[in-house]
Amino acid sequence: MDKILLHLASLQAIQERTIAETLVQGLRDAQPADVDYQTSNPYPDLIHIVGLSDRATQQLMSRAGRLRIPYIVTPLSSLQPWTHTRRPHFPPATILVASSQLEYEQLAKLYPENTVLLVGNPVVSAAITFDDYARRMQEVYAEALASHDAAVRDDIAQRVGKLGEEDAAICDILRQALYVGYEHRRHHIQQTTLDRLAATMTAANYDEALMADRLEELQLTSSFAQLETFLADHSTLTEGFMPIEAHPNKNFTLP
């Protein structure tokens, strides 16, 4: 985990806003290991939304959805059954963090498809310290990232699976290429992801003509040709192991 963007919603009630601000500041001050709190990074690994009532928060969630950036939500009781005529929708991988047993039970009923966790709020409870809260949230962050990554990989596997292709090597390369595309949209391509794909393309024995057909079916021919150039520039792939002719890299994207 590299960077966590912590967003503070502008709640209407002064008391709730004070609680949210105090909670956010305490979380930053605790500085749990492996977590870098940045509010200016437009492409974080994870977004933690504290409070949930203003338009800016809704826009933040919409942008996260478009870029497939995972986020967790600590509503601070802003999702009570009587506070919303239209409750916000959260992707199934989104984790909701309740601050009390009552809120936990209510969120579990309102969002049965989401994971709901109970983590005490050190601002209003002496039963948990800010250090303990930060350590617990670090575990929640790791869980959220793992859940989101599994969902992304499952979506990719389903997309490739619809081809009905039986060649395992072709399917593996397509899945890895689409995952590189996902990381590219997130502005966070891991070198290990590139190296693994380059190594797979170099070692695999597959029908290059069939691969070209599958790329055409997925409408990935142009993007994959640019990805080949990207792999040659940033990893170990060489021309002899490219199934189609490489094109100059013009900031490739794989939908």
What residue spans do the PLM features occupy?
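N-terminal subdomain of nucleotide-sugar transferases
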Residues: 1-39
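Short N-terminal targeting/anchoring amphipathic segment
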Residues: 39-57, 70-74, 187
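A conserved, positively charged/aromatic
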Residues: 66, 79-94
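A short beta-strand/loop micro-motif in the catalytic core of glycosyltransferases
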Residues: 93-101, 117
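Helix-loop-beta element that forms the nucleotide-linked donor phosphate-binding surface
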Residues: 104-123
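Short beta-strand->alpha-helix junction loop in the catalytic core
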Residues: 119-128, 134
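Conserved NTP-donor binding/palm subdomain of two-metal-ion nucleotidyltransferases/polymerases, i.e.
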Residues: 135-255
